[in-house]
């Protein structure tokens, strides 16, 4: 596929870019002057309170006499500790993602009979409309799977006989179908990308209704359709821990924000996918993968503590890695002492990394987790609590499952769709206002200048407080 460039536009872009940048800079002092909650964060790093939810709670600290006090992290689904859900599934050696979907959507744990019936509903709903694969996925392939899934979700609007009905029953129907179909679309988009961009064989496998969601994903992304029960349950674990993370994370907030406008389900979920695609959000797991790959390529012994520390120091000083100064997979907006998702993934990786041939990678990542807090302290001089987040270990788990890097973020999406749909439904049930925050204009008033009197070197003035004008 090619894109037709415009020579005139290409020649003009450099000068246009310079003018755009010059006229769109806002001074940090102005943000402080108007007490702007940049990133919708308070001055202490906590999130601005934008709503209420019964779906999920993310806990990483408590407030004592106005001070933020770190504590071990907890992720709570509908009042139930997510770790307890995982432990029960491990104890009973069963799949749990479908149970979590029910819990997030409907608010309580299902009985065995309800769960069995719901699994059947999801399995049947995985099927895509007739000709959808050929018309919407195989045509106009994309090098980015998230982009392709977002386009496909928008296209499903045209296949729905009642796409704009916002009744709870209709949106629940749409939600269940999307929760079932998005993993299927993801798998097929990956196969088409393999053929169109990687010049490899493409395998379009039919869905097997007897399989769980995790099993179905492995069945459709692997050319031989083969996987072990252990592999499927590892992926199921990943899906449980990624299913939701409260209403304030960017993609869920995006979904709720767009839902508040009264738009359709497909538009709201496509917006959530677009948010999760960003490297500062769902794309962070691939950034960890790239950082570890660069570390292994850069140092002679990536399992040596001193060499890893030297590399990470260079990363912090923007002298290595992607030159952003970020050590991906470390730190979180809420979690302080621990991220329960990272704890579970690290536990599994420590037990199975050697079996799957990733013992060295596990050691490297463990060193990154161990060394980073002290290195940041030396650089910044402040003893801020910093823990590994879910992205540090999720890529390693996906590597162990032979899931290619281009599917890391889509795998996150395939699980998080359940949380997005739950929050959309809650917004429809409880929300009554369109979300409309304020932006303060810092453009000074000025007179219109006739075109004959305009000067190419004119500079738009910066903001000046009224008392200083």
Model-derived segments and spans:
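Non-transmembrane, aqueous-exposed alpha-helical and coiled segments at domain scale
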Residues: 2-469
């Amino acid at each position: 596929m090619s894109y037709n460039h415009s020579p005139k536009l290409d020649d003009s872009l450099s000068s246009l870019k310079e003018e755009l940048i010059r006229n769109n800079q806002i001074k940090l002092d102005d943000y402080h002057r108007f007490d702007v909650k940049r990133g919708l964060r308070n001055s202490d790093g906590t999130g601005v309170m934008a709503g209420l939810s019964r779906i999920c709670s993310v806990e990483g600290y408590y407030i004592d006499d106005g001070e933020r006090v770190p504590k071990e992290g907890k992720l709570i689904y509908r009042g139930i500790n997510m770790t307890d859900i995982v432990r029960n599934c491990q104890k009973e050696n069963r799949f749990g993602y479908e149970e979590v979907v029910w819990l997030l959507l409907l608010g309580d744990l299902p009985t065995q009979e309800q769960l069995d019936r719901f699994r059947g509903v999801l399995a049947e709903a995985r099927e895509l409309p007739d000709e959808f694969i050929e018309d919407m996925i195989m045509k106009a392939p994309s090098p980015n799977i998230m982009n392709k899934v977002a386009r496909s979700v928008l296209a499903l609007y045209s296949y729905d006989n009642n796409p704009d009905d916002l009744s709870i029953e209709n949106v629940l129907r749409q939600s269940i179908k999307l929760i079932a179909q998005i993993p299927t679309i993801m798998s097929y988009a990956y196969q088409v990308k393999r053929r169109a961009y990687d010049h490899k064989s493409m395998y379009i496998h039919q869905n097997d209704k007897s399989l769980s969601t995790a099993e179905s994903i492995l069945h459709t992304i692997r050319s031989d359709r083969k996987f072990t029960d252990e592999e499927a349950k590892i992926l199921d674990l990943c899906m449980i821990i990624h299913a939701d993370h409260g209403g304030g994370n960017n993609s869920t907030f995006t979904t709720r924000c767009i839902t508040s406008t009264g738009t359709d389900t497909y538009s709201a979920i496509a917006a959530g996918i677009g948010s999760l695609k960003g490297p500062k959000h769902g794309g962070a797991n691939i950034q960890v993968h790239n950082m570890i790959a660069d570390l292994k390529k850069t140092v002679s012994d990536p399992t040596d503590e001193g060499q890893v520390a030297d590399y990470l120091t260079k990363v912090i000083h923007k002298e290595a890695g992607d030159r952003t100064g970020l050590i991906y997979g470390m730190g979180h907006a809420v979690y302080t002492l621990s991220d329960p998702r990272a704890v579970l993934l690290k536990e599994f990786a420590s037990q199975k990394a050697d079996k799957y041939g990733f013992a060295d990678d596990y050691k490297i990542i463990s060193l990154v987790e161990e060394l980073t807090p002290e290195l940041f302290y030396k650089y910044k001089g402040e003893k801020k609590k910093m823990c590994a987040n879910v992205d540090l270990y999720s890529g390693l788990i996906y590597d162990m499952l032979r899931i290619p890097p281009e599917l890391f973020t889509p795998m996150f999406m395939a699980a998080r769709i359940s949380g997005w749909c739950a929050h959309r439904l809650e917004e429809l049930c409880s929300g009554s206002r369109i979300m409309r925050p304020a932006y303060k204009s810092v453009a000074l008033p000025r007179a219109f200048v006739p075109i004959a009197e305009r000067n190419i070197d004119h500079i738009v003035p910066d903001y000046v407080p009224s008392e200083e004008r």
